[in-house]
């Protein structure tokens, strides 16, 4: 995320510089929470989180080159947004299952359901962030209802898939 901040600042891509700064603040908050509450997140969860973050910031930051349109790979590759939402929510689902699962006195189904709800709620917060950015600051159009509903769908699907994969019995 820090590389995206530097690259977007260098290229004068103010839209994605703003997104990257918010992402950097969010990442710093997660690191502080991890340290304060001693979550000890597993390495594979951290790597799983790194992939969609890198895809998101790289994909959008390419718009600074003015080669792939205003929103970089999000406009050049129509499926990019769906994939990033699926993988990002999948990482959130894994984190929720990891953190909440041992504390629940319920089975795998309840853990997967709750983790999917957490991932979907985080995805909803992203959609509200995009809407507020568009409404208050005139950022780029996010695709209206179709884009928002598809994002919410892939958030739920990714959150479910991540939690389901994380909680599956290991052989």
Predicted features and spans:
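Interfacial helix-loop-helix junctions of multi-pass membrane proteins
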Residues: 63-73, 80-81, 124-160
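Short hydrophobic/aromatic segments of transmembrane alpha-helices and their interfaces
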Residues: 43, 71-72, 111-114, 137-138
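Hydrophobic alpha-helical transmembrane segments
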Residues: 45-47, 112-117, 149-153
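"…centered on the first transmembrane helix and the immediately adjacent amphipathic helix/loop
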Residues: 1-90, 94
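Membrane-interfacial alpha-helical segments at the cytosolic side of multi-pass membrane proteins
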Residues: 87-104, 135-140, 156-169
């Amino acid at each position: 995320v820090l590389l995206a901040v530097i690259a977007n600042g260098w290229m004068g891509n103010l839209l994605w510089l703003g997104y990257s700064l918010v992402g950097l603040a969010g990442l710093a908050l997660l690191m502080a929470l991890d340290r304060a509450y001693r979550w000890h997140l597993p390495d594979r969860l951290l790597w799983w989180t790194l992939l969609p973050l890198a895809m998101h910031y790289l994909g959008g930051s390419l718009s600074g080159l003015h080669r792939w349109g205003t929103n970089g790979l999000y406009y050049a590759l129509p499926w990019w947004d769906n994939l990033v939402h699926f993988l990002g929510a999948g990482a959130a689902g894994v984190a929720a299952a990891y953190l909440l699962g041992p504390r629940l006195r319920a089975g795998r189904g309840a853990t997967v359901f709750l983790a999917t709800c957490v991932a979907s709620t985080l995805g909803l917060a992203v959609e509200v962030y995009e809407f507020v950015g568009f409404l208050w600051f005139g950022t780029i159009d996010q695709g209206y209802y179709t884009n928002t509903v598809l994002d919410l769908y892939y958030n739920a699907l990714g959150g479910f898939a991540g939690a389901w994969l994380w909680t599956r019995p290991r052989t």
